[in-house]
Amino acid sequence: MAKPNILLIVIDSLRFDKCHGPKKSSFTPTIDSLIKNGIYFEQTISSAASTILAVGSLLTGLYPFRNGLGGTGYQKLNPKITNLAKILNANGYTTYATAPEIANDFGLTCDFQNPDSSYDNYFSLFSGLGDEILTKFKNEHFQSPWFFYIHLFDLHSPVILPSSFNDAKFGISQYERMVSAIDDWLSKLLKFIDQKNTIIILTSDHGEYIPVLNTANGLINLESSSTEKNLWKIGNKIPKNLLPIKKKIALTIRSSRKKLKSSKINSENLSVYEKRVLFDSRMFTGHRMYDDLLRIPLILSGPEIPQNKIITNMVRQVDILPTILSLLSISPPPDIDGQNLLPMMNKKYDEELISYIESPPSVENESMKYIGIRTSKYKFIQNIKGKKFYELYDLEKDPLEEKNIFDENANQVKIAEKLLDEIRNKKPLQKNIEFEKNEKQ
């Protein structure tokens, strides 16, 4: 039997609840069809709310602190680390990538075989990129078996929406209307794909705060203005060697945006979660480790994959690489953090996975670094340097992460710290120690 082709689609900043489920208002028949003809993991956790760290985990099966990308500042992927492109190159696959240039800058696409693997960060599907990709699939005869990684930046803030989708029927926000627009483009792409012989993986790198809320007093929408979008474009054109200037522009945008938001609404009657969504920024504010930023979609569709199945168990971004390799009967590297999800896909699976999470480097304070763990029931966060800082959330009782309960759960904090130590130092996890035990001291 011929080896299947592999199409990996990463939609930057796509949240799990805006891909499938009752909280979405976008129109997504293509994504819906992929789910109907495959598997949807509805509780997939990203390693970090940053493109570089997250895609690094996806392509290596390793947490950021183990593949060279983790740290208090952005660093390149360790070139000695085995990654998905290297493995598939060695197993007879032709590997292609179309990803924003930021991925290439940090070594994420260096091992793909096509020389045109990167594009300008602000070249969008609807300004020519989409047609370029479709032309490749229409006219080029990719050498089979092939692996193609496509990373779409159109949902990344600020969203610049094509006018043809700026209509309420495509979603209540610019963000969701863009999801509809991307879905429409995906339908065109899939016409060129032999889905009977192609494994399709659709996922995201991280989530996003969407500053749009339905309240008793009406809709609050604080999405990016056209002025802010133009400032981002200017900042993007500044050379990398002028980083301090780029950072100054970023902080100026944040400051002006915060003032504008504060002037528009009265925050006194907003909940902790509502204030976070409206006023915080994934790229600037706090530790950036809440679920809006870390829960991502994961869809697998294609040969040998069960159909119309939704898996509620928590899985991790690092599990994607070993799962792809297992579908191809290729042994994954022995020392990775991820685990093969095929057993979970094919039968009931009761083992609880633990996800390691970490904060991206901070624009304002590069020494600020947080790490944590997440299970299906709890999330624990702590800082690495300085005075100890803890957050603990009961995700079953408090899914919006509004009440920090670490004060009354000292024993759980100790268990969580032990688990973090075991993960970061690659020790065997103590199976007899359950993070979920609610024992108070």
Q: Where do the language-model regions lie?
A:
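Catalytic domains that recognize anionic headgroups
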Residues: 1-441
